[in-house]
Amino acid sequence: MSRLLLTILMTVFLAACMPLTPAPVEAPLATPGVPVQANWTIRFTQSGGIMGMMREMEITSDGNLKVTDDRTGKTVTGQLTAGELAQLSTLMGGLAYDRPSGPTSCADCFNYTVEIASDTGKTFTAQADDTTLEASGLSPLADYLRTLMENALKTQG
């Protein structure tokens, strides 16, 4: 009797240690460029990493910029140049996002979220981490947004 009980307990224990299998999802479809409407807001979040970073940036279609670094408690505001705004619009229009197929096991990676809301009420959201960023097609936009964020935090501090 004790062997049967031990076998059952070990089976339950091992089953609890197994990774969860994500629910099946439809094959990810590539998202063509985000239509840039007359008025839009883009929110970019970079979180995670070894340092536990949490940075958020919001840019509006008129070029207003707000960056918050939760770890340092720093918030800066600014204005994009016409060239920076044009580059951002080009990258949004050329975005070809391919949603990663499942969770990754990268504990110390940065996680990136891009959310673009337009005045039509539609919102586009894309997520990736360091291991899926390049394959997702989000890399050019995320890299540019990360550069804008880092520059804003450097220049106003």
Report each predicted region and the residues it spans.
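Bacterial N-terminal signal peptides that target proteins for export
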Residues: M1-I8
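Short, well-ordered, aromatic-rich surface patches in folded extracellular/luminal domains
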Residues: L5, M18-G49, D70, K74, ...
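C-terminal motif of bacterial Sec signal peptides marking the signal peptidase cleavage site
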Residues: F13-A16
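N-terminal secretory signal peptides
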Residues: T45-D69
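Generic detection of short hydrophobic beta-strand segments and adjacent strand-loop junctions
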Residues: M57, V76-L80, A126
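Long, charged/polar, surface-exposed segments that mediate recognition or autoinhibition
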Residues: V76, T81-T90
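Generic short beta-strand segments
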Residues: M92-L95
